[in-house]
Amino acid sequence: MAHFEIQDLTFSYAAAKGRHSLEKVSLSIEQGEFLVLCGASGSGKSTLLRQLKTVLTPGGKRQGEIFFHGVPLSQVSDRDQAAKIGFVMQNPDDQIVTDKVWHELAFGLESLGCDQKTMRARVAEMACYFGIQDWFHRDVATLSGGQKQLLNLASIMAMQPEVLILDEPTSQLDPIAASDFLNTVRKINTELGTTVII
């Protein structure tokens, strides 16, 4: 069964006066896929990605359907979406909510109500997997843009999502940090089997 099934999705922003940002988009995204959306600036890539998580969906008029595991996305609880659909934003600073690296790694798990033992295990596992143990106790404000984006990714992956959505995650990074980040995303897809949409 597909993670996402998008059927004839049309969307226009409230201020767009009838101009569609997305028009009759149909797409099936299967488990384990690595899907890259390409297009010019303003072509609707970010708008489409934000449709895949209801708390991030912009205001506007939408027609068509989006299904997650065969269920209309609008009927999937926010908690289930938080646990199963990870989303990394363009700007690393837009997603960080705590002051310490370790707390940022644990924040999503706390929000999901995970017990302490599970939280500690997942935080340690992600710190090791992403190679960020050396800055585990650092203030988030001292991190570079690339480190912050890697922390965002590790924090999302600590929740073990089935799908990882990334909205131009390297747009704020230098070329070396961007390359390293994308290699890490590919590793998540191949080693962990996480579906990636970027």
Q: Where are the model-predicted features located?
A:
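A short, flexible loop at the N-terminus of ABC-type nucleotide-binding domains that lies
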Residues: 1-6, 11-24, 56-59, 77
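The feature captures the beta-strand-to-loop junction immediately N-terminal to the Walker
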Residues: 38-40
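Conserved ABC transporter NBD signature motif
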Residues: 61-72, 81
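Conserved ABC ATPase "signature" region
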Residues: 117-135
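Conserved ABC ATPase signature
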Residues: 139-143, 147
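Conserved catalytic motifs of ABC-family nucleotide-binding domains
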Residues: 160
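Catalytic Walker B motif of ABC-type/P-loop ATPase nucleotide-binding domains
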Residues: 164-167
